[in-house]
Amino acid sequence: MTTETSPMTEFQRLYTGRVWSVMQWDQLTALWQRIDPAAGWYLVAVGVSPAPTLVADAASVSAFIKRIDALLRADHHESYCGIVYADDLENPSLIKIYDPNNLGSSCGSSKNPPPPGWIMSRTAPEEIVSLRPAPANRKRWWQGLLGDS
């Protein structure tokens, strides 16, 4: 008996594929500067809201980058970054951003690393299952960013 598996979607390929770590804070600054906010980014808060079906507008992407950068620098009490990963550091299509307050083993050395807290994707995203619900303060942060009530 043979079983057929569905081919991976582009998002699944990017999400499960090789990513490169942004190790230093100055590398994170450079990554943000290379992102075109109007290039068609989907913004995902894993475990907070359903995967978006529409790309975010340029103003929302710019606001997200500014606020996530501030959050990471304030909450990740290390001299290095190491919690942001991209499929390509020069021209990213997918960026995984781990919540500094819910890291677990984000480097992938665990059989079940936690999902990232946030994803920026130029490909339509799919739901990412998180076994741990997002903390209330992260939900409020995301809702405030999007202007939701």
Question: What feature does the model see in each segment?
Answer:
Residues 1-49:
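N-terminal "first-domain core" detector
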Residues 2-5, 11, 74, 109, ...:
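Residue-level signal for the start and early helices of compact helical domains
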Residues 4, 10, 78, 126-127:
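Glutamate identity and glutamate-enriched acidic tracts
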Residues 13, 18, 34, 67, ...:
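Arginine residue identity/basic-tract feature
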Residues 20, 26-28, 93-149:
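Polybasic, proline/glycine-rich intrinsically disordered low-complexity segments
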Residues 34-103:
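Hydrophobic alpha-helical segments that drive targeting, anchoring, or assembly
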